[in-house]
Amino acid sequence: MLNMNLQLLASKKGVGSSKNGRDSISKRLGVKRFDGQLVTAGSIIVRQRGTKIHPGTNVGKGSDDTLFALVDGTVKFERKDKKRKKVSIYPVAIAE
């Protein structure tokens, strides 16, 4: 008679890892100073990717398309044309 000795070794099936579970940190983009607010020269008005809003009077544009004030004054959001928006800074007249 045949005598079979069957032994099962301890084993664990390979378990795949999830492909989810990551997230990038937020970039904190958007409008930082709104229409009618007073700003000082150098203040960041809008942080953006691409020129969603274009620079107007007394507004500079950084290399990353950030818009900032070149003079002290009041923020004013306007239409550049039918499709485009712009932001300008109008200096406040100082009463003496």
From Swiss-Prot:
This is Large ribosomal subunit protein bL27. The keyword rRNA-binding does not apply. Pfam families: Ribosomal_L27. HAMAP family: Ribosomal_bL27. GO terms for biological process: translation. One of its GO terms (cellular component) is cytosolic large ribosomal subunit. It comes from the Bacteria. Residues 1-9 form a propeptide. It comes from Clostridioides difficile (strain 630). The N-terminus is cleaved by ribosomal processing cysteine protease Prp. The keyword Amino-acid biosynthesis does not apply. GO terms for molecular function: structural constituent of ribosome. Belongs to the bacterial ribosomal protein bL27 family. Keywords: Ribonucleoprotein, Ribosomal protein.
